[in-house]
């Protein structure tokens, strides 16, 4: 992402990010643009291998993130405003794959900067901007999830498309503030002295910028993400550990301000419908007589890390007038509850059973302890699954980016980092752009269904 490495002798720098040292480089002569002989750092076989691997990375990144964007705009289940975060994140990753990685690859295999000074400045700015934006997006998504859980009614009524777009604009502004000023306003260090024979493309290498940009682009967002996700996990764990035997009668919470209508969503919670008709997050009901504490029966509490939850429910997908008899719905709900497997979503209850956690509280409720026990086992499985997803999200993010930013900061304070190791970390960070669609969508049923619909249109009736 950033184009600075250890300060080897400047006459040995053929380019800005991956400068070979004088002892280990193997160079092959090639014909340069001006007719002279230029040095290339790799043999033909290694060059072809690198081009194929990075080309595959580019294709996977573009394909996966384009699928995410199409799914959000075409699937009814993904119309929730918070899914705009994923659209913006996917757009940033696509831009990294199309406007940054190809030029980084050319810079690497050619051994010098071929594309001129003007594009060098643009390329450096876009490189830092897009990669920083991708990281800050993940931080914004984690904060959005945290607020939607801790301030369920208030925040979810305010979570409008306009507000989400404003947050997205803020993310891009923060990324630009980190990226652009040093490239435009400050003179690059080491500008004097003998100029190298090969054109280079270098970013600001002043110590203050390396440290501050590393903190702003990675360490601060990463710390926020970890703290927020730990808090989300603690909340979800506390809610899912309330057993059915200790739960009091569920009472319907008072209608939220603003005249929002409430609909049962089949999860033991109720979904608020805002003035614009957009569905908000499930509104909490009372647990053990404590108003405002969300009921622990809903899988959305346990699955707090499913970043973009479904905005539809089973009853909403049926056409009007297609309601089944209550008895049949109740039987189907019980049958599905008894078939919960580890990692599966909990069964959704019939519309008439929403908000009824105990026997005798409503006509559409589920009676008997068997269904409750099944739901409780399902919640335990969801907690395990939640732990796994949490580990994947934080682990992959840190694994991809921490090595690069750590070694990048070490070089600023004068520590020696092997050139090959730094190059590996540099390219490994780019892999996060291709992994984001997997991490943030494959664990969500609505995205899986949308992907199947996009890729297998001939099977549309079965999927929808």
From Swiss-Prot:
Q: Which GO terms describe its biological process?
A: platelet activation; regulation of smooth muscle contraction; regulation of vasoconstriction
Q: Which GO terms describe its molecular function?
A: alpha2-adrenergic receptor activity; epinephrine binding
Q: Which residues lie on this side of the membrane: Extracellular?
A: 1-47, 111-120, 188-206, 414-423
**Record site feature (Implicated in agonist binding and receptor activation), residues:** 213, 217
Q: What subcellular compartments does it reside in?
A: Cell membrane
- Residues with attached carbohydrate: 24, 28
| Cysteine-cysteine disulfides | 120-201
Q: Where is the composition biased (Polar residues)?
A: 19-29
| Modified-residue entries (Phosphoserine), positions | 345
Please note every region of biased composition (Low complexity): 251-268
Q: Which keywords does UniProt give here?
A: Cell membrane, Disulfide bond, G-protein coupled receptor, Glycoprotein, Lipoprotein, Membrane, Methylation, Palmitate, Phosphoprotein, Receptor, Transducer, Transmembrane, Transmembrane helix
SUBUNIT field: Component of the ADA2A-containing complex (ATAC), composed of KAT14, KAT2A, TADA2L, TADA3L, ZZ3, MBIP, WDR5, YEATS2, CCDC101 and DR1.
Q: To which protein family does this belong?
A: Belongs to the G-protein coupled receptor 1 family. Adrenergic receptor subfamily. ADRA2A sub-subfamily.
Q: What protein is this chain from?
A: Alpha-2A adrenergic receptor
What species does this protein belong to?
Answer: Cavia porcellus
The gene name reads: ADRA2A
């Amino acid at each position: 992402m950033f184009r600075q490495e250890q300060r080897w002798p400047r006459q040995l720098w053929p380019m800005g990010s991956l400068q070979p040292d004088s002892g280990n480089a193997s160079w092959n002569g090639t014909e340069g643009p001006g007719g002279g002989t230029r040095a290339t750092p790799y043999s033909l076989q290694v060059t072809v291998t690198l081009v194929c691997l990075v080309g595959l990375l580019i294709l996977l990144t573009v394909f996966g993130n384009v699928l995410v964007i199409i799914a959000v705009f075409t699937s009814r289940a993904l119309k929730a405003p918070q899914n705009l975060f994923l659209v913006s994140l996917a757009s940033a990753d696509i831009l990294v794959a199309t406007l940054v990685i190809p030029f980084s690859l050319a810079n690497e295999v050619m051994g010098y900067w071929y594309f001129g000074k003007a594009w060098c400045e643009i390329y450096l700015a876009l490189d830092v901007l897009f990669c920083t934006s991708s990281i800050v997006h993940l931080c914004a998504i984690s904060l959005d999830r945290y607020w939607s859980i801790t301030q369920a009614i208030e925040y979810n009524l305010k979570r409008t498309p306009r507000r989400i777009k404003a947050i997205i604009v803020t993310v891009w502004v923060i990324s630009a503030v980190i990226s652009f000023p040093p490239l435009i306003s400050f003179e690059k260090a080491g500008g004097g002295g003998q100029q190298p024979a090969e054109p280079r493309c270098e970013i600001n290498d002043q110590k203050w910028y390396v440290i501050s940009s590393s903190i702003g682009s990675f360490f601060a967002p990463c710390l926020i993400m970890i703290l927020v996700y730990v808090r989300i996990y603690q909340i979800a764990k506390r809610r899912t550990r309330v057993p059915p035997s200790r739960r009091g009668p569920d009472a319907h919470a008072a209608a939220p301000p603003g005249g929002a209508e409430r609909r049962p969503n089949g999860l033991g919670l109720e979904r608020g419908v805002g003035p614009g008709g957009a569905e908000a997050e499930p509104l909490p009901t009372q647990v053990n007589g404590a108003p405002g504490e969300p009921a622990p029966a809903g899988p959305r509490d346990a699955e707090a890390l499913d970043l973009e939850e479904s905005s539809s429910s089973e009853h909403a997908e049926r056409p009007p007038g297609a309601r089944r008899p209550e008895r049949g719905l109740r039987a189907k709900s019980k049958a599905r509850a008894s078939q919960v497997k580890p990692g599966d979503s909990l069964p959704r209850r019939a519309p008439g059973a929403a908000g009824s956690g105990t026997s005798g509280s409503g006509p559409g409720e589920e009676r008997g302890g068997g269904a409750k026990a099944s739901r409780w086992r399902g919640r335990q499985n969801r907690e395990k699954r939640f732990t796994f997803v949490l580990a994947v999200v934080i682990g992959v993010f840190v694994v991809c980016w921490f090595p690069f930013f750590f070694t990048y900061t070490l070089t600023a304070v004068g520590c020696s980092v092997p050139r090959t190791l730094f190059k590996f970390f540099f390219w490994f960070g780019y892999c996060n752009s291709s992994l984001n669609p997997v991490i943030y969508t494959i664990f969500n049923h609505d995205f899986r269904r949308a992907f199947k619909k996009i890729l297998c249109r001939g099977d549309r009736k079965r999927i929808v």
